[in-house]
Amino acid sequence: MKKTLGIIGGVGPLATMLIGEMIVRRTKAEKDQEHVHTIIDNDTSIPDRTAYILDNTKENPVPYLQRDAKKLAEYGAGVICIPCNTAHSFYEELQATT
């Protein structure tokens, strides 16, 4: 059984759509059923990552990212992807809690 991919989006809404398109275009599939099962949560309510990195008195985006990762896992995602450079600043914290 193939794993389901969960994408935490909205931390660059266009990046979310672009990675979705890249996955579809680069998947070697001859029919729809051979594509990667993907769940996209385009959550634009996630606070600005750069603002928090530069000033940690700003709202922390990590709890939002954790919530979305847990939600995607509950929906069946076995792998989580975040198409956002600055979100990767929180990778270790996210990895430890999800």
PLM region spans:
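N-terminal glycine-rich anion-binding loop in soluble enzyme alpha/beta folds
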Residues: 2-63
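Short glycine-rich anion-binding loops that position phosphate/pyrophosphate groups of nucleotides
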Residues: 12-13, 85-87
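Short, well-ordered coil/turn segments that N-cap beta-strands
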Residues: 36, 77-78, 98
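Short beta-strand segments at enzyme active-site cores
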Residues: 40-41, 78-84
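Short secondary-structure boundary/capping elements
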Residues: 60-64, 82, 86
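Non-catalytic positions within long, well-ordered alpha-helices that form the structural scaffold/packing
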Residues: 66, 70-76
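Short Gly/Thr/Asp-enriched flexible loops that form oxyanion-binding sites at enzyme active sites
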Residues: 86-98
